[in-house]
From Swiss-Prot:
Gene: KCNMA1
Ranges that cross the membrane: 60-80, 152-172, 188-208, 213-233, 238-258, 274-294, 341-361
Feature: compositional bias, Low complexity: 15-33, 1101-1126
Lipid-modified residues, S-palmitoyl cysteine kind: C91, C92, C94
Catalytic activity as recorded in UniProt: K(+)(in) = K(+)(out)
Modification sites for Phosphoserine: S680, S693, S697, S893, S897, S1136, S1139
Residues modified to Phosphothreonine: T678, T885
Organism: Macaca mulatta (Rhesus macaque)
Motif Calcium bowl: chain residues: 918-940
Function text: Potassium channel activated by both membrane depolarization or increase in cytosolic Ca(2+) that mediates export of K(+). It is also activated by the concentration of cytosolic Mg(2+). Its activation dampens the excitatory events that elevate the cytosolic Ca(2+) concentration and/or depolarize the cell membrane. It therefore contributes to repolarization of the membrane potential.
Main location: membrane
Protein name: Calcium-activated potassium channel subunit alpha-1
Length: 1151
C-alpha cells in the first residue's frame, strides 16, 4: 500500500514538474517575436510495477560511463602490462649480459653448477608458455572459419548481431530512456541473452588475439564495449537506454565474409558487390542511429530542452537525402550535436555516396546477362556446343544442324562460352531463340558444366578455330576441354574437332574416351588432305563427297547451264534408313536397282551383321550378299522424307506404283511388329554401325567367303618380304633416309616423270606442320596394286620437308625436289605438264592477320602454273631417247589406252589444262583462281566454278561433319574410310604408340584387308558402254553396269560446256551427283562408280620385286615414274582378257 502511495506521489511530482515547465515555456514563447513551439524535456515513464528513481532523474551517463570505463580501463591495463613487460625484458636483457660476462670470467669449471638452476627456470617458463599457447590455439580454432565449429560460431555471432539490431529497431519506437522491469520485459531478456553470448565470444577473441592492443581498438571490439556493458546496467537500474545500440549495424560489414564461409559467394564481382553494399548500408544505419539518439535526447548543455521527436526511419531518410545532397528540408537536425555530426558526415557520406553507388550500379549492371542455368524441357534432348564460338562458326553450324532437309530436329542447342556474344552473334541467337540458348561460362569449370546440365545432354560438341596461328595450342585447349567434360561426366558423348592428326593420339590417353560409345574426333587436317588425295585419284571426287555430307537447299535454275545440273546434284545428302522386310533375302545389286528405279533412291552401302553379330559397313558388297532383317542402308537422297520409302516399301501394296511419292506406310506395315519400326529416326542412326561391336573396326570389307584371297595370290605371297603395314591397309617399305629421295633439278629432268602427283608446298623451318602423311596414305592404300601407285614428288623447302619426313619414310615411290613452287624451272624439271594432279598447299596460311592475304602463295603458284606454256615435243623426245613413249600418247598399245578410263590429251601445251587442286583458307579468295569465271565475291564456296570443277578446296566445307556425325555416327566412319584409304582405330592406336607405320608380313588375314571397294571413272567414249554415251539414259547405264560388272554408278564428271551446241576448247569439268534415271548422257562424260576389288589385276606384275620401294620404281600400266636404269629390261606378262578389258575402260581409283 505504501509503495502504491509512493508511486502516485512520484507521478504527481512528475506532473507538477511538467506543468511548471510547460508554463515557463509558454511565457517564454509569448514574449518571443517568432512563435515557435518548444519540445518538452524527456520524461521517463514511471509505473508502480517498475521501481525507478524517485526524482525522475536521467541516468544516461551511467550507461555511457560503463562503456567508457570498460574501454579505457582495459586499454590502461593493456598499456600497463606492455610497459611492465618491456621494462622486465630490458632488465632481463641487462642481467643476462652480466651473467654471461660472469660465466666467461669464471670459466667452464663452474658452468655446470651455475646453469642448472637457470635451466630449471627456463623449463618452468617453457611449461607456462606451452600452456598459454595451447589455450590460445584452442581459442583460435574455436573462432576460426577453417573448422566447422568456427564457421558455426562465426555465423551464429553474425545472426545474433542482426537479431540485436532488430531489437534495437523495435525499441527505437520507445523513448530514449525508460524504466523497465527485466523480469517482465521480453525484449530486454532476449537482448540480455544475446549480449551474454557476445561477451563469451569477446573473451575467445581476446584470448586468440596475437596483438591485444590492436584487438582492443578494432571495430568489432568497440561495438561490444558500447553495447554489452549497458545491458547489464539496465538490469541493475531497471532502466533501458537506447544509447549506442545502433552500433550493432556495423556488424553488417562482415556480411560478405559470412556468405563466403557458407560457400554462397564465389566470384570476385559478387564478393565486391556485397562488400560495397554492406559497408554502405551499415554506415547509413549507424549514422541514422546517432542522429536518432541526439535529436530525441537534446543537447546536454541545453538541459535536453532542444530535443525533437524523430523516429529512427525518419533519421534514415534524413541521412539518405543528406548523402545525396538533395536536402529537401522537411526533416532536419535541430540539436547542436546533430548539426555538428551532419557537417562531418556530409563530407564523408557524399564521398562514399559518389563512389560506392556508381560502382554498385555498375556491378549490378555488369551482372552476367547469360548467367543462370539451363532448364531441361521434358521430352526434348539438348546438346552442348563449346570451344571456338564466333559468328562464323556458329552460323555455319546452325545452318547445317537446323537445315530443313533434316527430319524434325527436336534438339535444343546450348552454347557455352566464357566471353559474352557480340551484337551480331546475339542477334543470331535471337533469331533461333526457340532452339538455341547461350550461357556464359567455361567447360573447364564444373559449376558451369552443371549449369548447362551436361550430365543429361545428349552430346557435347567442341568446335576448333581452323584459322589459329598455333594449331597445336588450339588442339591442346580442346583436349583439356574433353578432359574436363569427361572428368565431370564420363558417359557423355563428345564430338570434337582437331586440327592436327598427331594430336588425336592424346585423346586415347583419356580413360573414359570410347569411340565405340559414340566419341568421335574430326581431324580437319586428316580429312582435308584425304579429300585432296582423292582428287589426285579421281578429279572432282572431293567436291562430290564434300557436297554429299553437307546440307544444301535445292536451288532451281531454269536455263540450260552447267549450274543447273550441278545444283541439282548439290541438293543430295547422305542418309541412313532401315530396309523394309520386302527386301529380305534379295541380293545387294537387286535391292540397289529396285531402290534406284522404283524408289528414286541411291543406296551405296549397308550395315551387315555377321553370324557372330558383329556389325560392319559394306560399300557395294556385290551379288553374293543377301539382305538380312533389320539391315541399315546408306542412301543418297535430297531429304530424309524420301529415304523413308525404303522403310515403307511393301511389295504387295507398292509393286504397281510408278510415282515414288505415293509410297507411304501401308496397312501391311501397320500390322507388322518389327524392331526397326520402334526406333525413332535418331535412334535408328545412333544404333546402327560399329558401336555395338567391341571387336569390329570400321573397315570396308566384303562378305566372309571373299575375305580369303585366291589360291594363286596365296601361292605368290612372299613371307620374307614386308610389302604392307602390319594391318595390311597400306603399302609399306623400309625406312629411307631423306637424302636418298632428294632429286636435284638435273636429276629430275633426266628422270622421265609422267602420270605422277606433284605436291607444291609452301613452308619453312618455323611453319606449323601440315601432316603430309594424311595426303600420302590414301595414295598408298593397299587396295592399289604396287604398279598402280602414282609417284609423288614434293616441291618445296627441304627444311620443312625434313620435319615431315619422319612420318613419310615408310611409303614407297616418294621423291623430293628442293626448291620453290614459284620457280618454273623446278616445275618443268618435274614434268608438271605430264602429271595426273598438281596439289598446292601452304603451311604459312595462318600466320597472316589479313585474311585476304592468307592464300597469296597458293594463288600465285596456281596462276603461275596456268600461265606456263609447253612444247609437246619435249616430253616425247626425252622419252623416246630412252626408248619409251609417255603413257597416253601411243593409243595403239593396250597398256597405253585410256588412262584409267580418262583420255589424256594428246599433248598439253598450256598450263590451263594441267589438273590442279588448290587449298584455300579464306573462301572468298576462290574468286582469284579462275580469271574466266564470273563468280561474285559474296558467292558461297560451293556455288563457285573452281569448287564445282574440283580445282579448289577449303577446310570450311568440313564444318558440316559436326552435325552429320551427331545425327549419324556411322557417317564419319564412312567418310574417313573413303578419304583416308582405310584408316582404322587400331591403326591410329599404333601410330599414337610409334608415330610411324610398322611393316608386317603378308598373311591371308592382312591380304584380306586389301579386298576393299574402289572408285572408278568410267569413260563413255568407247568400250562396252559407248552405245549409251551418245544420248543414252543414265538409268540404263546404271542398271547395265550393276548387272554386268557389279559396278555402282553414283555421279558424272562432265565437261563444263558440254551443253553448248557449238564445240568448245574448254577442258574444265564439273560434278553432277546422283543424276535421275532419265538424265541424258554425252560421249565425253566420265562416270563415277564403285567397283569390286580385282585380285587378278596385279598378276601381270607379280614378278616385280617389291623390295625396290624407291624413286627408281616399276612402270605402271597407265601412269608411273619411268626411271631410265630400272625400266630398260622390264617385261610385261600378258593379262587375262577380262582384266585387260576392265582396265581399258575404267579409271580405277581407291578410296
Amino acid at each position: 500500500m505504501s509503495s502504491n502511495i509512493h508511486a502516485n506521489h512520484l507521478s504527481l511530482d512528475a506532473s507538477s514538474s511538467s506543468s511548471s515547465s510547460s508554463s515557463s515555456s509558454s511565457s517564454s514563447s509569448s514574449s518571443s517575436s517568432v512563435h515557435e513551439p518548444k519540445m518538452d524535456a524527456l520524461i521517463i515513464p514511471v509505473t508502480m510495477e517498475v521501481p525507478c528513481d524517485s526524482r525522475g532523474q536521467r541516468m544516461w551517463w551511467a550507461f555511457l560511463a560503463s562503456s567508457m570505463v570498460t574501454f579505457f580501463g582495459g586499454l590502461f591495463i593493456i598499456l600497463l602490462w606492455r610497459t611492465l613487460k618491456y621494462l622486465w625484458t630490458v632488465c632481463c636483457h641487462c642481467g643476462g649480459k652480466t651473467k654471461e660476462a660472469q660465466k666467461i670470467n669464471n670459466g667452464s669449471s663452474q658452468a655446470d653448477g651455475t646453469l642448472k638452476p637457470v635451466d630449471e627456470k627456463e623449463e618452468a617458463v617453457a611449461a607456462e608458455v606451452g600452456w598459454m599457447t595451447s589455450v590460445k590455439d584452442w581459442a583460435g580454432v574455436m573462432i576460426s572459419a577453417q573448422t566447422l565449429t568456427g564457421r558455426v560460431l562465426v555465423v551464429l555471432v553474425f545472426a545474433l548481431s542482426i537479431g540485436a539490431l532488430v531489437i534495437y529497431f523495435i525499441d527505437s519506437s520507445n523513448p530514449i530512456e525508460s524504466c523497465q522491469n527485466f523480469y517482465k520485459d521480453f525484449t530486454l531478456q532476449i537482448d540480455m541473452a544475446f549480449n551474454v553470448f557476445f561477451l563469451l565470444y569477446f573473451g575467445l577473441r581476446f584470448i586468440a588475439a596475437n596483438d591485444k592492443l590492436w584487438f582492443w581498438l578494432e571495430v568489432n571490439s568497440v561495438v561490444d564495449f558500447f553495447t554489452v556493458p549497458p545491458v547489464f546496467v539496465s538490469v541493475y537500474l531497471n532502466r533501458s537506454w537506447l544509447g549506442l545500440r545502433f552500433l550493432r549495424a556495423l556488424r553488417l560489414i562482415q556480411f560478405s565474409e559470412i556468405l563466403q564461409f557458407l560457400n554462397i559467394l564465389k566470384t570476385s564481382n559478387s564478393i565486391k558487390l556485397v562488400n560495397l553494399l554492406s559497408i554502405f548500408i551499415s554506415t547509413w544505419l549507424t549514422a541514422a542511429g546517432f542522429i536518432h539518439l541526439v535529436e530525441n535526447s537534446g543537447d546536454p548543455w541545453e538541459n535536453f530542452q532542444n530535443n525533437q521527436a524523430l523516429t529512427y526511419w525518419e533519421c534514415v531518410y534524413l541521412l539518405m537525402v543528406t548523402m545525396s545532397t538533395v536536402g529537401y528540408g522537411d526533416v532536419y537536425a535541430k540539436t547542436t550535436l546533430g548539426r555538428l555530426f551532419m557537417v562531418f558526415f556530409i563530407l564523408g557520406g557524399l564521398a562514399m555516396f559518389a563512389s560506392y553507388v556508381p560502382e554498385i550500379i555498375e556491378l549490378i549492371g555488369n551482372r552476367k546477362k547469360y548467367g543462370g542455368s539451363y532448364s531441361a524441357v521434358s521430352g526434348r534432348k539438348h546438346i552442348v556446343v563449346c570451344g571456338h564460338i564466333t559468328l562464323e562458326s556458329v552460323s555455319n553450324f546452325l545452318k547445317d544442324f537446323l537445315h530443313k532437309d533434316r527430319d524434325d530436329v527436336n534438339v535444343e542447342i546450348v552454347f557455352l562460352h566464357n566471353i559474352s556474344p557480340n551484337l551480331e552473334l546475339e542477334a543470331l541467337f535471337k533469331r533461333h531463340f526457340t532452339q538455341v540458348e547461350f550461357y556464359q561460362g567455361s567447360v573447364l569449370n564444373p559449376h558451369d558444366l552443371a549449369r548447362v546440365k551436361i550430365e543429361s545432354a545428349d552430346a557435347c560438341l567442341i568446335l576448333a578455330n581452323k584459322y589459329c596461328a598455333d594449331p597445336d595450342a588450339e588442339d591442346a585447349s580442346n583436349i583439356m576441354r574433353v578432359i574436363s567434360i569427361k572428368n565431370y561426366h564420363p558417359k557423355i558423348r563428345i564430338i570434337t574437332q582437331m586440327l592436327q592428326y598427331h594430336n588425336k593420339a592424346h585423346l586415347l590417353n583419356i580413360p573414359s574416351w570410347n569411340w565405340k560409345e559414340g566419341d568421335d574426333a574430326i581431324c580437319l587436317a586428316e580429312l582435308k588432305l584425304g579429300f585432296i588425295a582423292q582428287s589426285c585419284l579421281a578429279q572432282g571426287l572431293s567436291t562430290m563427297l564434300a557436297n554429299l555430307f553437307s546440307m544444301r537447299s535445292f536451288i532451281k535454275i531454269e536455263e540450260d547451264t552447267w549450274q543447273k545440273y550441278y545444283l541439282e546434284g548439290v541438293s543430295n545428302e547422305m542418309y541412313t534408313e532401315y530396309l523394309s522386310s520386302a527386301f529380305v533375302g534379295l541380293s545387294f545389286p537387286t535391292v540397289c536397282e529396285l531402290c534406284f528405279v522404283k524408289l528414286k533412291l541411291l543406296m551405296i552401302a549397308i550395315e551387315y551383321k555377321s553370324a557372330n553379330r558383329e556389325s560392319r559397313i559394306l560399300i557395294n558388297p556385290g551379288n553374293h550378299l543377301k539382305i538380312q532383317e533389320g539391315t541399315l542402308g546408306f542412301f543418297i537422297a535430297s531429304d530424309a522424307k524420301e529415304v523413308k520409302r525404303a522403310f515403307f516399301y511393301c511389295k504387295a501394296c507398292h509393286d504397281d506404283i510408278t510415282d515414288p511419292k505415293r509410297i507411304k506406310k501401308c496397312g501391311c506395315k501397320r500390322l507388322e511388329d518389327e524392331q526397326p519400326s520402334t526406333l525413332s529416326p535418331k535412334k535408328k542412326q545412333r544404333n546402327g554401325g560399329m558401336r555395338n561391336s567391341p571387336n569390329s573396326s570400321p573397315k570396308l570389307m566384303r562378305h566372309d567367303p571373299l575375305l580369303i584371297p585366291g589360291n594363286d595370290q596365296i601361292d605368290n605371297m612372299d613371307s620374307n618380304v614386308k610389302k604392307y603395314d602390319s594391318t595390311g591397309m597400306f603399302h609399306w617399305c623400309a625406312p629411307k633416309e631423306i637424302e636418298k629421295v632428294i632429286l636435284t633439278r638435273s636429276e629430275a629432268a633426266m628422270t622421265v616423270l609422267s602420270g605422277h602427283v606433284v605436291v607444291c608446298i609452301f613452308g619453312d623451318v618455323s611453319s606449323a606442320l601440315i601432316g603430309l602423311r594424311n595426303l600420302v596414305m590414301p595414295l598408298r592404300a593397299s587396295n592399289f596394286h604396287y604398279h598402280e601407285l602414282k609417284h609423288i614428288v614434293f616441291v618445296g623447302s627441304i627444311e620443312y620437308l625434313k620435319r615431315e619426313w619422319e612420318t613419310l619414310h615408310n611409303f614407297p615411290k616418294v621423291s623430293i625436289l628442293p626448291g620453290t613452287p614459284l620457280s618454273r624451272a623446278d616445275l618443268r624439271a618435274v614434268n608438271i605438264n605430264l602429271c595426273d594432279m598438281c596439289v598446292i598447299l601452304s603451311a604459312n596460311q595462318n600466320n597472316i592477320d589479313d585474311t585476304s592475304l592468307q592464300d597469296k602463295e597458293c594463288i600465285l603458284a596456281s596462276l603461275n602454273i596456268k600461265s606456263m606454256q609447253f612444247d609437246d615435243s619435249i616430253g616425247v623426245l626425252q622419252a623416246n631417247s630412252q626408248g619409251f613413249t609417255p603413257p597416253g600418247m601411243d593409243r595403239s598399245s593396250p597398256d597405253n589406252s585410256p588412262v584409267h578410263g580418262m583420255l589424256r590429251q594428246p599433248s598439253i601445251t598450256t598450263g590451263v589444262n594441267i589438273p590442279i587442286i588448290t587449298e584455300l583458307v579464306n573462301d572468298t579468295n576462290v574468286q582469284f583462281l579462275d580469271q574466266d569465271d564470273d563468280d561474285d565475291p559474296d558467292t558461297e564456296l560451293y556455288l563457285t566454278q573452281p569448287f564445282a570443277c574440283g580445282t579448289a578446296f577449303a577446310v570450311s566445307v568440313l564444318d558440316s561433319l559436326m552435325s552429320a556425325t551427331y545425327f549419324n555416327d556411322n557417317i564419319l566412319t564412312l567418310i574417313r574410310t573413303l578419304v583416308t584409304g582405310g584408316a582404322t582405330p587400331e591403326l591410329e592406336a599404333l601410330i599414337a604408340e610409334e608415330n610411324a607405320l610398322r611393316g608386317g608380313y603378308s598373311t591371308p588375314q592382312t591380304l584380306a584387308n586389301r579386298d576393299r571397294c574402289r572408285v572408278a571413272q568410267l569413260a563413255l567414249l568407247d568400250g562396252p558402254f559407248a552405245d549409251l554415251g551418245d544420248g543414252g539414259c543414265y538409268g540404263d547405264l546404271f542398271c547395265k553396269a550393276l548387272k554386268t560388272y557389279n559396278m555402282l554408278c553414283f555421279g558424272i564428271y562432265r565437261l563444263r560446256d558440254a551443253h553448248l551446241s557449238t564445240p568448245s576448247q574448254c577442258t574444265k569439268r564439273y560434278v553432277i551427283t546422283n543424276p535421275p534415271y532419265e538424265f541424258e548422257l554425252v560421249p565425253t562424260d566420265l562416270i563415277f562408280c564403285l567397283m569390286q576389288f580385282d585380285h587378278n589385276a596385279g598378276q601381270s606384275r607379280a614378278s616385280l620385286s617389291h623390295s625396290s620401294h624407291s624413286s627408281q620404281s616399276s612402270s605402271k600400266k597407265s601412269s608411273s615414274v619411268h626411271s631410265i636404269p630400272s625400266t630398260a629390261n622390264r617385261q610385261n606378262r600378258p593379262k587375262s582378257r577380262e582384266s585387260r578389258d576392265k582396265q581399258k575402260y575404267v579409271q580405277e581409283e581407291r578410296l
